[in-house]
Curated annotation (Swiss-Prot):
UniProt enzyme class: transferase
Source organism of the structure: Cereibacter sphaeroides (strain ATCC 17023 / DSM 158 / JCM 6121 / CCUG 31486 / LMG 2827 / NBRC 12203 / NCIMB 8253 / ATH 2.4.1.)
Compartment annotation: Cell inner membrane
GO CC list: plasma membrane
Family: Belongs to the glycosyltransferase 2 family. OpgH subfamily.
UniProt pathway annotation: Glycan metabolism; osmoregulated periplasmic glucan (OPG) biosynthesis
Keyword Acyltransferase attributed: no
SUPFAM superfamilies per UniProt: Nucleotide-diphospho-sugar transferases
Membrane topology: Multi-pass membrane protein
Enzyme Commission number, as recorded: 2.4.1.-
Name the record gives this protein: Glucans biosynthesis glucosyltransferase H
C-alpha cells in the first residue's frame, strides 16, 4: 500500500530528524564546554560537567525538535473519514470522579448532553459517572446533583451514576471495573476527566474515525486548557493554546501508529481495551510497587503490543480541560505524575512492547530527572575550583617565556546563547508562524501575540527555578521510597496568600539562600550566572502568591475567550444557574456498586 509506506516513511524520517537535532545540539554543547574547561588543563570535574551538559542539552534539543517538525507540517484530517458520515455505534462517555465538586462536574455533563442533542446522534451516547468519592458529604451532593441532572436533561436511561464501595486500583481500577461489568454493552468508550468538556460534534467525529478504521484501538485528542483566571493559570493556558498545537503536530509525526494516551479526552475500542489493558499490580510497596499510577501510557503500550493502532489526531477540535491555577496545585499534580513516570522503570523491559513505547517510557522518566542533571552541573561548577590543576605558565622544559592560557570566553558565551536558543527560539518561531498563518487573530492580533509571547517567556523564566525545585524534591522523595498517594485535585480560583505560599515553599527559600551563599564563598565568579536561578527561589513565596491572583490584564488572551464555542457557553450558563440553587438537603444512597 503506497499510503501505508508513505506514512511509515514520514514517521521514520521525523524520528531521525528529531534525533539529529537533539544529538547535534548535545554534541555541540559537549565539545564547546570541553574546550572551555580545558583552558587551564582538563580535569575530572571538566569531564563531569561536559557530560552533564551533553545529557541536559540533548533533552532540550529533543523538545525543540517537536516544534521544528510541527512548524513544517499542517493538521490533516484522515482521508478515509468523511466529516458528514453517519454513525451507528453506541458509545459510553465515562466520567470518573474522586472527591470532586459535583456542581462543576455534572454541569459539564449537562452541557455535553445538550451539545450532543444538537446533532442527530444523541441517542447513541450514554454517560456513566463513575464515583470513587470517599467523602460522604460530597457523595451526598453527588446523588443530589445526579438526580437534578437526570431531571433537567430528561436523561433516564442515558446518564448513569454508580459509586464504588472500595476504590481498588484508583482511576484505572474504576474504569476497569466498569469495562468488566458493563463494557460489553458499548463498542466504544470515551474516557474523560472530571474537568473535561467536549463538543457534541467532536464526540460524533471521534466515533466516525473509530468506525472508519477497524484496527484503531485508541484515538487521543489534544485538550485545550480553558477558563483559567489566575496569572499562573492564564500564562499556562496561553502557552498551551499557542504552542501546544505545533508541538503536538511534531509529536504526532514521530509517533505514527504507536501514539500516546493521556488518560482523558480520548476514545477507546472497548473490546481492544478489555483484551489488552489489564494492568498488573507491581510487586513491592509504593512508590515503585503497587498499582500502576501513570496507567495511561502503559495502556497505550499494551494496545500497541496487541497489534492495535494507537493514534493521536492533532486536527480534532472541541476538546477541553481545565488546569491548575497556581504553582502549588501544579506541583501537587506533578508530584503524582513524577511518581508514575519513575514507576515506569519497572515496566520498561516488559516483554513484547514496541521499541517506540519503551522510548516513550524513557522520555517520561527523563522529563523528571532532567532537573537533577542541571542541579548536578551547578554543584559541579561550584566545586570545580577545588579540582582545577594549578596554573603552569612554563609547561615546556627549558623554554624561557611563559605560556598563558588562551581566552575561551567566547565559547562559554556561545554555549549559553545556544542553550537559551533551544529554550526561546521555538516559542518565538511559533509566534511568528501564528502571525503569518493568521492564527494570531484569535489571540487578539499580531501585536498582542508578540507581547504575550515575550511576557510568557519572562514569566516562565521566573517560575522555572521554582518548578525545578519542586520536581527535584519529587524525584528525591520517590527515590527515597516516599509514596505520594492519591491526592484530590484542587479546582477553583486557586488564590493563595503569602502565608500559604510560604508554607508550601519555605524550603525552596532555604535551598536558594544556601546555594547562593555557597557559590559566593567557594566560587564568587559564578554568582552573576546563578542569580537568575537563586533569586526566584529566594522570593518563591511572593512569586507563588502574586501569580495565584486573578489576572485583569489583556495579556495572554486566547481564542476561546474571544469566541467561546457553544459547549463552553452552555456550560457557563448551566453552572451559573446551578450555583444559584440552594444547598441540597441529605439525599438517600443510590446506585452504589459494591465491587
Amino acid at each position: 500500500m503506497p499510503a501505508e509506506r508513505r506514512r511509515r516513511a514520514v514517521t521514520l524520517a521525523s524520528r531521525l530528524v528529531a534525533a539529529a537535532i537533539s544529538l547535534t545540539a548535545a554534541a555541540g554543547a559537549f565539545f564547546l564546554f570541553l574546550q572551555f574547561g580545558s583552558t587551564d588543563g582538563l580535569d575530572s570535574m571538566d569531564i563531569t560537567r561536559s557530560v552533564l551538559i551533553l545529557v541536559s542539552t540533548s533533552w532540550l534539543g529533543w523538545g525543540a525538535a517537536h516544534a521544528v517538525l510541527g512548524l513544517f507540517s499542517r493538521p490533516q484530517r484522515p482521508a478515509n473519514v468523511s466529516p458528514d458520515a453517519p454513525i451507528s455505534t453506541r458509545t459510553v462517555i465515562l466520567v470518573p470522579v474522586y472527591n470532586e465538586d459535583p456542581v462543576a462536574t455534572f454541569s459539564r455533563i449537562a452541557a455535553m448532553d445538550a451539545s450532543l442533542a444538537a446533532t442527530p446522534w444523541r441517542d447513541l451516547f450514554h454517560f456513566a459517572i463513575l464515583s470513587d468519592t470517599r467523602d460522604e458529604a460530597i457523595a451526598a451532593r453527588e446523588r443530589f446533583w445526579f438526580l437534578r441532572l437526570l431531571r433537567e436533561r430528561d436523561a433516564e436511561g442515558r446518564i448513569f451514576y454508580r459509586r464504588r464501595a472500595v476504590n481498588r486500583g484508583r482511576k484505572a481500577g474504576n474504569i476497569e471495573d466498569f469495562i468488566q461489568k458493563s463494557g460489553s454493552a458499548y463498542p466504544f468508550a470515551v474516557i474523560l476527566d472530571a474537568d473535561s468538556l467536549m463538543e457534541g460534534e467532536t464526540l460524533v467525529d471521534m466515533v466516525r474515525r473509530m468506525e472508519a478504521e477497524p484496527r484503531l484501538g485508541l484515538l487521543q485528542t489534544l485538550p485545550v486548557v480553558t477558563k483559567a483566571r489566575a496569572r499562573f493559570g492564564r500564562s499556562m493556558q496561553f502557552s498551551a493554546a499557542l504552542h501546544a498545537p505545533v508541538f503536538a503536530r511534531g509529536l504526532a509525526m514521530m509517533q505514527g501508529r504507536t501514539g500516546p494516551f493521556w488518560g482523558h479526552n480520548a476514545i477507546v475500542r472497548v473490546q481492544a481495551f478489555a483484551e489488552s489493558c489489564g494492568l498488573p499490580e507491581l510487586s513491592g510497596p509504593p512508590p515503585f510497587g503497587g498499582h500502576v499510577m501513570s496507567h495511561d501510557y502503559v495502556e497505550a503500550a499494551l494496545l500497541a503490543r496487541a497489534g492495535w493502532i494507537v493514534r493521536f489526531d492533532d486536527d480534532i477540535r472541541g476538546s477541553y480541560e481545565e488546569g491548575p491555577e497556581n504553582l502549588v496545585d501544579h506541583a501537587k499534580r506533578d508530584r503524582r505524575w513524577c511518581q508514575g513516570n519513575l514507576q515506569h522503570g519497572r515496566i520498561l523491559f516488559a516483554p513484547g512492547l514496541c521499541g517506540w513505547n519503551r522510548f516513550v517510557f524513557l522520555q517520561g522518566i527523563m522529563a523528571y530527572i532532567a532537573p537533577l542533571f542541571w542541579l548536578g552541573f551547578i554543584m559541579a561548577s561550584i566545586a570545580a575550583p577545588f579540582f582545577a590543576p594549578p596554573l603552569d605558565y612554563f609547561p615546556v622544559p627549558y623554554w624561557p617565556f611563559p605560556v598563558f592560557p588562551s581566552d575561551e570566553t567566547w565559547k562559554a558565551i556561545g554555549l549559553a546563547v545556544g542553550i537559551f536558543g533551544l529554550l526561546l527560539l521555538p516559542k518565538l518561531m511559533i509566534a511568528i508562524e501564528a502571525i503569518v498563518t493568521g492564527r494570531a487573530a484569535g489571540f487578539g492580533g499580531a501585536g498582542r501575540v508578540l507581547v504575550s509571547t515575550l511576557a510568557e517567556l519572562v514569566f516562565s523564566s521566573i517560575i522555572a527555578p521554582i518548578l525545578m525545585a519542586f520536581q527535584t524534591r519529587s524525584v528525591l522523595q520517590v527515590l527515597l521510597g516516599r509514596d505520594g498517594g492519591w491526592p484530590t485535585n484542587n479546582r477553583g480560583d486557586g488564590s493563595l496568600s503569602v502565608a500559604q505560599a510560604w508554607s508550601a515553599s519555605h524550603w525552596i527559600v532555604t535551598w536558594g539562600l544556601i546555594g547562593i551563599g555557597a557559590t559566593y564563598y567557594f566560587a564568587p565568579g559564578l554568582v552573576p550566572w546563578l542569580l537568575p536561578v537563586a533569586l526566584p527561589m529566594i522570593f518563591s513565596p511572593l512569586v507563588i502568591a502574586v501569580t495565584s491572583k486573578r489576572s485583569r490584564s489583556a495579556l495572554f488572551t486566547m481564542p476561546l475567550e474571544v469566541a467561546p464555542t457553544p459547549v463552553l457557553l452552555a456550560h457557563d450558563a448551566i453552572l451559573a444557574d446551578w450555583e444559584r440553587s440552594p444547598a441540597p438537603e441529605a439525599v438517600p444512597a443510590l446506585a452504589v456498586s459494591h465491587a
